[in-house]
C-alpha cells in the first residue's frame, strides 16, 4: 500500500506541485481513507520526503547501471546527467522544494554532487584513455558541469530558452563533447 500511495502522490505532485496536492486526493484516487494513508506516512511532508528519496535513489541506481554497461564516453556523460527512471522529478518541483522544503532540497544537492563526482571520474577515465584532451583543466570542467546542472534545473531558463530539461542536457553534452573530444 505504501508504494501505491507514493505512486499516486508522484502523479499528483507532477500535476499540481508539492504544495497543491492533497492527502484527500490521494485517498480519493486510491479509494482509501486518510487514516490508511497515516498508517504509512506521518504527514504530507513525509510523503514529499519519501517521493524525493525514492526518485533520488532510483536516479543514482540508473546512473550506476548505465555506467556498468560498456558505453562510449558520450553515452556515459549523457546517462550521468540525464538518468531515466520511473520517478523523474520535474524541474518545477525541484524549484518548489528549494523554496518550501529546504531539508528535502539538500538531498537533491547531494544527488547533484554524486553526479558531478561521477562526471569527474568519467572525464579522468577519458583523459587516461586518450578520448579527452589531456590539456583539459579538470577542476574547470567539473565546475562547468556543476553550473550546467544548475542551469538545467532552472525553470525560468528552460522557459526562456524554449527547451525541455532533456533538450537542454542534450545541447550541453553536445557542446562540451564536441569541444573536448579528440
What are these regions (language model features)?
Residues 66, 91-99, 152, 156-159:
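Secondary-structure edge/capping motif, primarily at the C-terminal ends of alpha-helices
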Amino acid at each position: 500500500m505504501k508504494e501505491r500511495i507514493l505512486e499516486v502522490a508522484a502523479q499528483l505532485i507532477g500535476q499540481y506541485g508539492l504544495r497543491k496536492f492533497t492527502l484527500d486526493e490521494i485517498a480519493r484516487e486510491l479509494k482509501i481513507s486518510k487514516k490508511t494513508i497515516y498508517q504509512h506516512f506521518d504527514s504530507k511532508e513525509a510523503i514529499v520526503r519519501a517521493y524525493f528519496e525514492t526518485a533520488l535513489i532510483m536516479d543514482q541506481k540508473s546512473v550506476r547501471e548505465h555506467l556498468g554497461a560498456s558505453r562510449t564516453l558520450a553515452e556515459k556523460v549523457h546517462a550521468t546527467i540525464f538518468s531515466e527512471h520511473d520517478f523523474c522529478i520535474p524541474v518545477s518541483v525541484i524549484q518548489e522544494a528549494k523554496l518550501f522544503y529546504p531539508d528535502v532540497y539538500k538531498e537533491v544537492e547531494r544527488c547533484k554532487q554524486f553526479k558531478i563526482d561521477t562526471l569527474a571520474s568519467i572525464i579522468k577515465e577519458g583523459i587516461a584513455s586518450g578520448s579527452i584532451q589531456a590539456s583539459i583543466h579538470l577542476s574547470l570542467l567539473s565546475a562547468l558541469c556543476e553550473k550546467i546542472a544548475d542551469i538545467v534545473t532552472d525553470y525560468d531558463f528552460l522557459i526562456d530558452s524554449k527547451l525541455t530539461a532533456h533538450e537542454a542536457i542534450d545541447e550541453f553534452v553536445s557542446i562540451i563533447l564536441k569541444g573536448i573530444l579528440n
